[in-house]
Regions:
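Beta-propeller and closely related beta-sheet repeat lectin domains
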Residues: 73, 120, 273, 280, ...
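Beta-sheet repeat architectures centered on beta-propellers
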Residues: 1-106, 112-128, 376-391, 395-654
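Disordered, low-complexity "stalk" and linker segments at domain junctions of extracellular
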Residues: 2-15, 20-25, 29, 64-67, ...
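Hydrophobic core segments of beta-strands in well-ordered, beta-rich domains
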Residues: 89-91, 276-286, 326-327, 333-343, ...
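Beta-propeller fold detector
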Residues: 106-110, 148-151, 236-238, 303-308, ...
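Predominantly extracellular/luminal cell-surface or secreted proteins
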Residues: 98-99, 177-181, 226-230, 292-305, ...
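Residue-level signature of beta-propeller blades and closely related beta-rich strand-turn architectures
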Residues: 93, 135, 288, 343-344, ...
């Protein structure tokens, strides 16, 4: 913005306002405080070219409809070994479908999904596309079918026999778990066999031992034995290498103090709310207070500690629940699994869980070392957390926050709110737990709900300009980035209620073939910092980049009597006469044709001016359109005139 300075007290002092650089949206500030660069309104616009406002991207249906009128619930990407990408869709009927590019959808068999599940998370690892939704057990797509982990039962029928030892006052509590290739069952019912000696006093050379037996479990590959001399505090004691259903405890086995008896069954894999890949392991959260990790290499996706996996309750008693998990980094830059929680206030906390190797006797075990980051920054929107530019962008009930390294400080992760300028808009959103986000074209796009009836708007952060743009009058359940066989990358939206995916592209005009209203409104810009100064505004000018369609340029302002009103409007038309609307001092409207013939604008820069002839204390600019095929970039807005009055108006004293 450039304002010619006022010098002296002459009423003929020239005045000029030029806005040729722009900032983003700022719903936080009132019109008169915004200044010239922030936008009071930027409806259906996007920031481009060093911060210029431009018509937003349009939408069109993409590909074919799901069979039988099935509506979309979720969609993920599976990449084959030849680089071809398949879209894997989950319908609201619980069935899965696949297609390549924009071809026909075919059903995927092997498993169906609970129709009440609404949030899906997809993750591809080692030629398997894992799918979690918080309701169904972990399911994977192997390139042909869905495969769901099959749960096995916990052992039953525990019994025991003493050898040399006799019954006595010393308790020996046992629980047995069964393992398959995926995980471990919950512990069996606790079994207590008393002895006349404490376990650490048994004499092996005297054949003092206990034999514990249990019933075989169908599908088990081996068993683990947990022991304690106190009820309910069993820790891992030993494991069988076969399917034998007996264990001889002679007192020489050492308990593992880091491995307690499981409370959850992982043989079918838990019903993970979300999964992530970090440190060559799969990580999962169950939507309560537990976090799971799998083994590595051939044991990837196996959550039993026998295969390098494990689990840990972290949030017990805090009132928080896990909402999101991802791979991020510590303050030192080391990659680490990072979990984000939620609480009733709509915020929460951030935890990082590095794994450390610890030797117990001749066995090396993996021990988690969770740490909580400072600050009450959590999320309620699992699909809304976005990783971009070495930062996490985290939406919660208070706003959108970032997690990244603090400038000029090493080994420190810092959090801070990014959404201050748009706080009133953001806090007016409904059902923020359904916010979804994606990083695409150096912009972070979010979709959310204003009405409370599904996501119906979009807004975003231009990470190059570090400015917000809002809002777009379209919304989606979530986003999907896909690369077609020809190498073209597209951004797709998964509709709230629809049978086809929606493409979102700068090369498309309109929404699904229909025009949308777009509007840029500046702040109410004072003529001077001195509120008593008025200017006789002689003319206003807008310079548009490659405009098409019908566009209106409106000038508004505060007049001598303190009234705020629309002063004049200019219509800029493609293939139409340019028509001016002028509002006189008495409120009358006159029309005037300025061109003798239709004009088609194809220039990179098209300036259009409008005569004003009004005395104003503050001025505001409005550029808008609702015609089909409209497209424009705002390059510059300006006005000029002369200082009209320097005397304080009498109205100000009333």
């Amino acid at each position: 913005m450039k304002i010619l300075p006022i010098t002296g007290r002459s009423s003929k002092t020239p005045w000029k306002l030029i806005i040729d650089s722009f900032k983003g949206s700022a719903s936080l500030l009132d019109d008169i405080i915004l200044g010239a660069k922030f936008a009071k309104e930027a409806l259906n616009l996007i920031l481009v070219q060093d911060g210029r406002w431009k018509t937003r991207w349009g939408t069109a249906v993409y590909g074919q409809a799901l069979p039988d009128g099935t509506q979309f619930m979720a969609c993920g990407i599976y990449e084959k070994t030849d680089g071809t990408q398949e879209k894997i869709a989950i319908g609201k009927n619980g069935k899965g479908y696949r297609c390549v590019d924009q071809g026909a959808w075919t059903e995927v068999t092997g498993a169906t999904f609970t129709t009440t599940a609404t949030k899906y998370n997809f993750l591809q690892s080692v030629n398997q596309l894992y799918n979690s939704n918080g309701v169904d057990r972990l399911t994977r797509y192997d390139g042909s079918n869905f495969v769901r982990y099959t749960q096995i039962a916990a052992p039953t029928g525990l019994s025991g026999v003493r050898n040399v030892l006799t019954a006595g006052a010393y308790h020996n509590y046992y629980k047995i778990t069964a393992l398959n290739q995926v995980g471990e069952t919950q512990g069996s019912a606790e079994y207590d066999l008393t002895t006349n000696k404490a376990r650490n006093s048994w004499i092996t050379t005297s054949n003092e031992y206990l034999t514990i037996s249990w019933s075989a479990v169908v599908g088990a590959s081996r068993y683990q034995i947990y022991y304690s001399d106190e009820s309910g505090k069993e820790m891992l004691l030993a494991e069988t290498s076969t399917t034998d259903v007996t264990f001889k405890d002679d007192g020489t086995y050492i308990q593992n103090p880091f491995s307690t008896c499981p409370e959850d069954d992982t043989t079918g894999a838990p019903a993970f709310a979300m999964i992530a890949d970090s440190g060559s392991r799969l990580w999962g959260i169950t939507g309560d207070d537990k976090i799971f990790w799998s083994g590595t290499g051939l044991d990837l996706g196996i959550f039993s500690d026998f295969h390098g996996g494990g689990w840990q309750p972290i949030l017990g008693g805090t009132g928080e629940k896990f909402e999101h998990i991802c791979h991020f980094r510590s303050g030192k830059g080391d990659g680490v699994a990072t979990a984000i929680t939620r609480n009733k206030a709509g915020i929460g906390s951030i935890w990082q869980i590095p794994l450390e190797a610890t030797a117990i006797a001749d066995t090396t075990i993996i021990v988690p070392n969770p740490s909580k980051l400072p600050g009450p920054i959590g999320t309620v929107a699992a699909l809304g957390v976005v990783s971009a530019n070495d930062s996490l962008y985290i939406p919660n009930s208070r706003g959108i926050f970032s997690l990244n390294n603090k400038a000029n400080v090493t080994n420190i992760l810092s959090t801070g709110e990014l959404s201050g300028n748009i706080r009133p808009f953001y806090r007016g959103l409904q059902n923020i737990e359904n916010i979804a986000g994606v990083w695409y074209d150096s912009k972070i796009f979010f979709t959310a709900s204003e009405s409370g009836n599904g996501n119906d708007v979009m807004f975003g952060l231009d990470t190059e300009q570090n400015e917000w743009f809002l809002k777009w009058t379209i919304g989606f359940k979530s986003f999907l980035e896909v690369t077609e066989s020809n190498g073209t990358t597209k951004l797709l939206g998964i509709p709230e209620n629809g049978t086809q995916l929606i493409e979102i592209s700068k090369n498309i005009k309109g929404d699904l073939g229909q025009p949308f209203y777009q509007s840029w409104l500046s702040g109410l810009i004072p003529i001077s910092n001195d509120s008593t100064v008025f200017a006789k505004v002689q003319e206003a000018l807008v310079e548009l980049g490659r405009p098409t369609g019908t566009i209106f340029f409106e000038i508004l302002g505060l007049g001598q009597k303190g009234e705020f009103s629309s002063i004049a409007t200019k219509q800029i038309a493609d293939n139409l006469n340019a028509i001016e609307f002028w509002t006189g001092d008495l409120g009358e409207i006159t029309l005037k044709d300025e061109e003798d013939a239709p004009v088609t604008y194809s220039q990179a820069s098209v300036p259009k001016a409008k005569k004003i002839g009004k005395s104003l204390r503050a001025i505001q600019f409005h550029i808008y359109s609702s015609s089909a095929d409209t497209d424009f970039t705002i390059l510059k807005v300006q006005a000029k005139g002369v200082i009209d009055k320097l005397k304080t108006p009498s109205k100000f004293f009333k």
